[in-house]
Amino acid sequence: VMVVCPLGVKQEFVVKDGPRLGMNYRYVGCDADADKALAETPFLITNYERIRDGQLSERWIQANISGICLDEGAILGNLVTKTQQTFTDILSEIPYRWVATATPAPNDYRQLIYFADFLGDGDAGLSLTKWFGRNPDKAGDLQLMPHMEREFWLWVSSWALFVNKPSDLGFDDKGFE
C-alpha cells in the first residue's frame, strides 16, 4: 500500500498517524528505496513529484502496489496538468484507489469529477458535459446545472464517502471540536 502526499505532510504519517494505527510507514523516493522498504513494511509513503517525475517508475508501481491513497487529492483538480494526467495513466491499473481531501475547493464541485475520473467511476469530460453548463456571467466558468443537481449528488454518493467528524464513523467526537 502506498500513500502519496505533499512532501511536508509525510511526517504526519511516518511519526504520528502510522504508529498510532500500528502502521510502520517508510518514505521512498525511488524504485531501489521502495524495494528495501518493502522488505520491512507493506506501508510506503512518497510525495507527488516522485511519481510525476518518474523516480518511482510506472513499472515498479504497477508490479508492487495493490492499493494507493492520494492525500490532499486537490492535486487532481485540473484535467490538463502533468500531475493529473500522469497519475491517471500510471495509477489507473491499481485495483484499490482512494483520494482523501479535507475539502474540495469551496464551491468547485468539478474537483469531485476529477476524483471520480481518477478512481475509475466516471470519465471527467463526459461528466462535466452531463452535469455542468457554462456560466453566462463569467467566461470560462462552469456551473452545476440546477435541473441536474439531484442526479449529480446521487451519482457522487454512489462512489464517495463524506466524513465530517469521528462520530460519522462510529467514534467519539470528544476532543474533535
Regions found by a protein language model. Give the residues of each.
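Residues immediately flanking
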Residues: 7, 48, 72
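Alpha-helix capping/helix-boundary segments
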Residues: 9-10, 50-51, 104-105
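Conserved nucleic-acid-binding Ia/Ib motif block in the N-terminal RecA-like helicase ATPase lobe
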Residues: 2-43
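Conserved strand-helix element at the start of the C-terminal RecA-like helicase core
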Residues: 3, 7, 169-175
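Conserved helix/coil segment N-terminal to the catalytic DExD/H
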Residues: 32-67, 78, 82
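Conserved P-loop NTPase motor "coupling/switch" region that bridges the ATPase
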Residues: 15, 20-24, 39-40, 67-68, ...
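Short secondary-structure boundary/capping segments
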Residues: 1, 34-37, 59, 88-90, ...
